[in-house]
Amino acid sequence: MIVFFPACLRHFRLCAWHEEGAPGPEERPKAFLSRTMSSQHDDEAQKEAAFAAEHLAAESMAADMDPWVVFDARKTPRAEFEEWLQTYQPSRVSRFGDPERNAEPVGWIAVYGPSFCPEGGDVVGLQEDWERLQGSGRHITFDTVKELALNRRVLTGKWLMHLDSGFKVDHAWRGIARAALEGRIGVAKVSPCCPDSERKQVICVYTEDFTNEEQVLVADAVIRATGVKCLLSYKPDVYTYLGIYRDNRWHLCPTIYESKFDLECIPRRSRIINKVNNTEVT
């Protein structure tokens, strides 16, 4: 078993919500009660969304900080790959370990391809820029977040696929892991199972630059060539580093591409939507 401890810890900040101004004196007799109730409802919805985003961020950070099971094709003989793959099938590796078998928690199972190079970029500087951006009063959009990522060279991103635990995730992971071993993708990882949960497991396939659309599309083609036909979503890592998950206060969609496999098209292919500008790119 090869164990990897991430060197970079992520920092997250839960931002305060801004309330609307109170109604003027002439409005209060008619509107004060309804606006107060509406404001309270909005505050509750915002708090729930903030809690959900914070919870997802905490879960992600916890998984990243726990030991990873890694097959590193740069160092490990390929002859050992099949045994490793069989030993660490994602549906049989427990996220929280097994005290009875003296098994420790596992954050992720990953394969590093032969040309894998750890991501660069200034994550700490990125997070400092993010703090300043939030305090500046500027409207926060995909383009402003992209600007931060470009300035700090934090450009990696990943295709995500969510699969039922058991045969489906094990079969899909086998194809994806082999693609990484052969160098068709740089790195891929899969979440371990949670035995007492119905939550699906997720496979992530990384690209070096989320702003390079051609690179993103090539990775989708590699995934489809392994036989994966489920819905795929693409998320820039900058969103993860900044703690931007679904239901965030800026109403940003944390995924910027969506890929659906068209079974009726001949030849069969992906239909990929750019979710930022709502255009079909394939």
State each model region's role.
Residues 17, 29-155, 246-282:
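Charge-rich, low-complexity segments
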Residues 21-24:
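Residue-identity detector for glycine
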